[in-house]
Amino acid sequence: MLPPININKWIEENKSLLQPPVGAKLLYTDIDSTFVVMIVGGPNQRTDYHVNETDEFFYQFKGDMILKIVDKDGSFRDINIREGETFILPGNTPHSPQRYRDTIGLVIEKKRSSENIDKLLWFCDNKDCRKLLFSRSFHVDDLDLGKQLTPIINEFYGNEENRTCKHCNHISQKPTVNDYIQ
């Protein structure tokens, strides 16, 4: 059993690791647990929507964030999670965490079984369209989710065909860090 971790000290010592595009680092790496505990820093550069079959717990440690979601009825909405607030996201809810510069959050997810499949989805960013552009399913086989997301994010942005909407012909562009600064 590991000793307790001083989160403030851990953040100070590991701040340089909380970098775009995902900015997530595991808080615990040497334990066999049911949970994956991550510290996530901003800004991020994500426009994807992640789908995890299990619930996710968010605690906004420093600064505010926006959790963009797609409801069961297909409508898009934003959930504001302010500094000091927590939120539990139900499993199978497409979500896109939007973190701004100098923000830090804690995210707890259930460790995936061999049957659990995650997805990354991108929707047309033309607000009058919002059709699905691109998706990838994958099994989280490494506790470091950020390591697995980055190649898929790069695959999406690396090919204009992936970013071109077949319904309205809009081409989604890769965001810059400045797009996520308040």
UniProtKB/Swiss-Prot annotation:
It is an enzyme of class 1 (oxidoreductase). It is found in: Cytoplasm. GO terms for molecular function: 3-hydroxyanthranilate 3,4-dioxygenase activity; ferrous iron binding. SUPFAM superfamilies: RmlC-like cupins. Signal peptide: none annotated. O2 binds at R46. Keywords: Cytoplasm, Dioxygenase, Iron, Metal-binding, Oxidoreductase, Pyridine nucleotide biosynthesis. Its EC number is 1.13.11.6. The keyword Oxidoreductase applies. Its cofactor is Fe(2+). Pathway: Cofactor biosynthesis; NAD(+) biosynthesis; quinolinate from L-kynurenine: step 3/3. Belongs to the 3-HAO family. Catalyzes the oxidative ring opening of 3-hydroxyanthranilate to 2-amino-3-carboxymuconate semialdehyde, which spontaneously cyclizes to quinolinate. This is 3-hydroxyanthranilate 3,4-dioxygenase. It comes from Dictyostelium discoideum.
